[in-house]
């Protein structure tokens, strides 16, 4: 896809899991790769957002150019990872997935991409379950990410949560009809294999 790059967010602390979630394997395939495969099946190039402490482990599994470390941005958490990818690819829109969304399916991703392509006037494209927006399977456009970066640089931005950013933006929400693809795994007890 011409103007879209996939990003697998792997840079979290994984405190509740007790280990780097992106490196947990299912049948010898790390979760980060499982998530990437889902986007690559749709011909979307993929990069991995990692923190500096993870870089050597990820470079052992993936090409160096696909491993993007957090940039020096005055924000923390997943937004830092997303904006670091944006700084590397400032003209591309980003399809972002968390590394633990291993149940995400091609149909759900294809539906998101179809809406992104047919309704191009939005800043963000995300799924929604009742009143809760699911930010970690969403498309974030380059123009609005540039604006978010400028707001951070100008210190005019105070709430860095995805829920806030999506609430104030021109966000296209898509109602979730099947919860299974959105399961994420936060604790060892969540893993059923």
For the regions a language model picked out, list residue spans one by one.
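Short, conserved phosphate/pyrophosphate- and ester-handling motifs at nucleotide-, phospho-/glycolipid
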Residues: 141, 187
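Nucleotide and nucleotide-moiety/phosphate-recognizing core
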Residues: 2-135, 142-147, 153-159, 164-181
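RNase H-like, Mg2+-dependent phosphodiesterase core
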Residues: 147, 189-193
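PAPS-dependent sulfotransferase catalytic core
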Residues: 184
